[in-house]
Regions:
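Conserved serine/cysteine hydrolase catalytic core
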Residues: 168-212, 218-221, 225-227
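Catalytic nucleophile loop
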Residues: 102, 106-107
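N-terminal cap/lid segment of alpha/beta-hydrolase-fold proteins
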Residues: 1-16
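Active-site loop/oxyanion-hole signature of alpha/beta-hydrolase fold enzymes
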Residues: 58-101, 236
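Flexible "cap/lid" loop of the alpha/beta hydrolase fold
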Residues: 108-115, 119-150
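Catalytic active-site module of serine/aspartate enzymes centered on a nucleophile-bearing elbow/loop
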Residues: 215-248
Length: 248
C-alpha cells in the first residue's frame, strides 16, 4: 500500500487537526481514532495488515486528536472539544459509507456522535465500556502520567496539559448519562472489541449488550490499548466487519 497523504483541517475553534490518508480518491471510508495519549501512528500497522482487496476499496483515515501528535495544542481538552473535532472530520470527509473505529476515548467519541445523529454508518469500539469504571479510568491516567515522567518516547508528542488531566475525565463523569442515551439510540452496525486484560470485563460486555442489543462482540488477548497490542488481530476483525455490511 502506498505511503499515506497528510491531511490538515481546522477544528471549529481553529485548532489544526492532522490525519494520514490512504486511497485518497475512494469514498468508502474507515476513520481511525486513537486512544487518549496515542497518536495516529498506532493505526499504521493495523492498516498494513488489511488484505489487499479491502485496501483497494476503502479510504483509510488515521487522525490525531487535538493535543496529540501533529495536531495543534489547545487551551481546552473537554469531551465537547473532542466531539466537535470528530464532527469536523465527518463534515470534511463527506463519505458514505463512513465507518468509525476508535480505541478508548476515540471509540467513546464515535459512539456519542453516532447516537446523537452524526452521519456515521458503522461503529467499531475498541475496549470502550458504556459506563467506564472510575478506578480503571484513573489507573489509565496514572499509567500515562508515569510514562510521561519517565520520559517515555510515546509521550513526547502529547501536550503536557492533556497528560496532567485537563478536566476530561471529570467532564465525562459529570454527564455520563449522555453516553448511556447515545448507546441506547444506536441503530447502525456496532462492534465492540474487548481487550481481555483491558477495562472491558464480563460485566461491561453484558452491559453493552443490554444497551446495544444488536451489537457484535469480539475478544482479543490484549490490554486496554487494543490496536497497539494486536494490530493484526484488530485488522482481521475490522476487515470482517467491513465486508459483512459493506461488501461492494
Amino acid at each position: 500500500m502506498e505511503a499515506p497523504t497528510l491531511w490538515s483541517v481546522a477544528a471549529r475553534d481553529g485548532t489544526k487537526l492532522i490525519a494520514d490518508v490512504w486511497n485518497v480518491n475512494e469514498n468508502s471510508t474507515l476513520l481511525l481514532l486513537p486512544a487518549g495519549a496515542e497518536t495516529r501512528s498506532v493505526w499504521h500497522p493495523v492498516v498494513d495488515h488489511f488484505p489487499p482487496d479491502t485496501k483497494s476499496r476503502w479510504r483509510f483515515v488515521a487522525a490525531d486528536h487535538r493535543g496529540h501528535g501533529d495536531s495543534g495544542r489547545s487551551e481546552s481538552y473537554l469531551f465537547k472539544d473532542f466531539t466537535d473535532d470528530l464532527l469536523t472530520w465527518i463534515g470534511q470527509l463527506s463519505a458514505r459509507p463512513l465507518v468509525v473505529a476508535g480505541g478508548s476515548i476515540g471509540g467513546a467519541l464515535a459512539m456519542v456522535a453516532a447516537g446523537e445523529g452524526a452521519a456515521i454508518d458503522g461503529l467499531a469500539m475498541l475496549d470502550v465500556p458504556i459506563v467506564p469504571a472510575l478506578e480503571r479510568v484513573m489507573f489509565e491516567r496514572r499509567r500515562i502520567q508515569a510514562a510521561a515522567k519517565t520520559g517515555h518516547a510515546s509521550m513526547t508528542s502529547i501536550d503536557p496539559r492533556y497528560i496532567r488531566g485537563g478536566g476530561l475525565i471529570e467532564d465525562v463523569y459529570k454527564d455520563i448519562d449522555r453516553w448511556k442515551r447515545a448507546a441506547c439510540r444506536l441503530t447502525i452496525p456496532t462492534l465492540l472489541v474487548a481487550g481481555d486484560h483491558g477495562v472491558v470485563r464480563t460485566a461491561e460486555v453484558e452491559q453493552f449488550r443490554a444497551y446495544v442489543p444488536h451489537s457484535e462482540i469480539e475478544h482479543l488477548q490484549t490490554g486496554h490499548l487494543v490496536a497497539r497490542d494486536d494490530p493484526k488481530g484488530v485488522a482481521a476483525i475490522l476487515d470482517r466487519f467491513l465486508n459483512r455490511y459493506w461488501r461492494q
